[in-house]
From Swiss-Prot:
Causes the migration of the distal retinal pigment into the proximal end of the pigment chromatophore cells and thus decreases the amount of light entering the retinulas. May also function as a neurotransmitter and/or neuromodulator. Eyestalk sinus gland. The keyword Secreted applies. Keywords: Amidation, Hormone, Neuropeptide, Neurotransmitter, Secreted. GO terms for cellular component: extracellular region; synapse. GO terms for molecular function: hormone activity. The keyword Manganese does not apply. This is Pigment-dispersing hormone B. It comes from Faxonius limosus (Spinycheek crayfish). The lineage of its organism: Eukaryota, Metazoa, Ecdysozoa, Arthropoda, Crustacea. Its main location: secreted. GO terms for biological process: chemical synaptic transmission; neuropeptide signaling pathway. Belongs to the arthropod PDH family.
Length: 18
């Protein structure tokens, strides 16, 4: 499921720095 990974990696709020 690339959608899940893309959603997590595409979430600037998850890292905050990115």
């Amino acid at each position: 499921n690339s959608e899940l990974i893309n959603a997590i990696l595409g979430s600037p709020t998850l890292f905050g720095e990115v």
